[in-house]
């Protein structure tokens, strides 16, 4: 009975979310097409914010202010340009040393570990995190600390070669996931995402979708929060075997990613694979091309590697389709040319026939005139 109620609640919440968006999946895909064409607009807005922060950093009169602005610049560059985000994490570390503030040093070290983890430097990231004394960490940094360990071990598990290593990395991921749940407030986005992730790991997909949708319906969510929520919802649907649900929420996640002008993302790449499987080669090519361009600009080497494994297949299909269309166009032009020739020949013969008829009528008229004279 409890399971039936849970499924019913999930369906109701799913309906509410669909109503909130009020768009079909096809409409969302068309929206993505438009955003990709005009994505420079969103990038320009982000660049303007970065320029303003850099100006404030130059005008700062104390190391405390400089540290704060470097932190905000790190946040802006996070998932936008990893090399630049690492530079500002290093600047934070320098300022923290100068101010002799241990919590600032730990925060800067975790910033650097985050960038290392995102670029696939897992060993270096763990070594850096291992230098942090957990006992001296202030309460406000515990969530970030556990989040980094959970994320890095999760990625290591995803890319592990042997089953033994994969099992061990996922065991560590589970431990840090539980630690995160203990330090995050139960009404926070972080808690909901981690709890939903735990439900998904334990095959409780409907429960995960229910809590994610419930949080998604809260007002005033920023694009980044929407992107994370809808991506996790799509994962729930994927594991349920619901491709349409997966596609719909991947589209919502991709829209939020593109609007927030991030360059390091997953949703659009996965959406490209889905639409490719459905035979929409042009759209798949455009989505994957956009993902590759953004990953390259961001210096997101791991994402670039993931895309490069799929791109040749879709690119080949796209080129074959383009070649086939060119051949069809050539055949059409040849057919049109032949038809034009036949038409000209037909017009010529009709014209000659009409002249013959005219001469015949003229001859007949002359004969009739002669008869009247006789």
What residues fall within each predicted segment?
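Alpha-helical transmembrane signal-anchor helices
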Residues: 319-361, 365
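Alpha-helical transmembrane segments and their juxtamembrane interfaces
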Residues: 12-13, 372
